[in-house]
Amino acid sequence: MEDGKITTGQAASLPFVEQTVYHGRPADETGRLLKEIRTYDILDKLKIPFTRVDHQEIATVEACGELDKLLKSPLCKNLFLCNSQKTRFYLLMMPGRKRFITKEFCRQIGSPRLSFAPEEYMVKYLDITPGSVSVLGLANDTKKQVQLVIDRDILQGETVGCHPCINTSSLCIAMKDLLEKFLPYVEHDYIEVDLPWE
């Protein structure tokens, strides 16, 4: 059950359906996809509080400036990567303004060169489509095929912004809850990296 509105404001540069930040899940879930509802069910089960903004589809992190302000937490850049054999998969959470340097990332995790994974594997393992990639999708990775990797700057934040497996809503949750409640529940650990700002 949704706790209610906590703030309202115009976000002129983004086509929000609503310019309101809410506590918790939608009171009316009509038209919401099952994977989004499942995400709210898990967060509620784990007693993880969150704030939420509903909006039209947002395709890039660069388009999220006003959304960051409403949530009071920057959305991560989430990259879904794989090796050339498509046998090892990684979900990288990093600051949106950092540039992804493949060679440096691979060096830090001790992996051969990686590339962006095809959409079919994103759907297969995380039940997520491009633009909706989120750490919360690990709840769908029941066979543990995806290794989570988190940049140090994300880990040092008090909160993290992410999608509930669909990019028409964005959530803000406490980093502590992500690390101490959500990840143990979905039985995933993480590798820490420290990617450069260059």
Give, region by region, the residue ranges found by the protein language model.
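Extended, low-hydrophobicity, polar/charged segments
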Residues: 2-198
